[in-house]
Structures are given as C-alpha cells and as structure tokens.
Amino acid sequence: MPDYLVVLESAWTIRDADSVDDAISIAISEAGKRLNPTAKFVEVEAGILSCPYCEEELPCTLIVARTALVGVKMEMKVYKADSEEHARRIALSTIGKALRDIPLEIIEVEEL
C-alpha cells in the first residue's frame, strides 16, 4: 500500500484586513487553530499565483473594501492508502471535518 502527498487549496475570507501580509497571516493562523486539535499534521502555507505575462510569483490574495479573499495551500501525507482516490477521500474527510464551512479543492496528489 503506497503513501501519498495530497495538496488542497482553500479560500478564506478575512474582514478588516489592512494589508495583503496581514490578511495572509490571519488566514494561516485561523487555519492552524482549526486544524490543531484534530489534524495538526497538516502543513499550511499561503497560496501562490504566477502572473501570466511576466511569470512572477504573486500572493494568492485579493483585498477589496478591507475584506480579503486569501488562497491557502494545505499539504497532508496519507499513509497506506489503497489508491490515489482513497488518499483523496481520506485527506478531504480529515481536513473537511476541521474546516467545516471552508471550501476545499484538491489540486495535486503525488505518490511518495
């Protein structure tokens, strides 16, 4: 039974954000707080986008009227899964229970 690395993307809404860095810090902190009791083994970091014109890496954050939408990337290692699909379901179930109302999408599954 192989091990897998499952990478998920989530969207966090942050109110009263003063800057992009502030919004990212708050989103990562909130994700960590929610994941800590049940899924503290999940790696959380800020999402990154590539500019289609200059290919420069940019933070995955948008602020309008002091409300930010922050893309957060989460990585979870799933051990001894039956298949890639099984690893996806395990990761979604584990992280989804901790982040009940946060939208999640799997962006990559890699066999270790």
From Swiss-Prot:
Q: Cite a single Pfam family from the UniProt record.
A: DUF555
Domain of life per record: Archaea
Entry's InterPro entries? UPF0212
Q: Which PANTHER family does the entry link to?
A: UPF0212 PROTEIN MJ0068 (PTHR42199), UPF0212 PROTEIN TK1194 (PTHR42199:SF1)
Query: Which NCBIfam families does the entry mention?
Result: PRK03922.1
Question: Which family is this protein grouped under?
Answer: Belongs to the UPF0212 family.
HAMAP family this protein is in? UPF0212
What name is this protein filed under? UPF0212 protein Mhun_0078
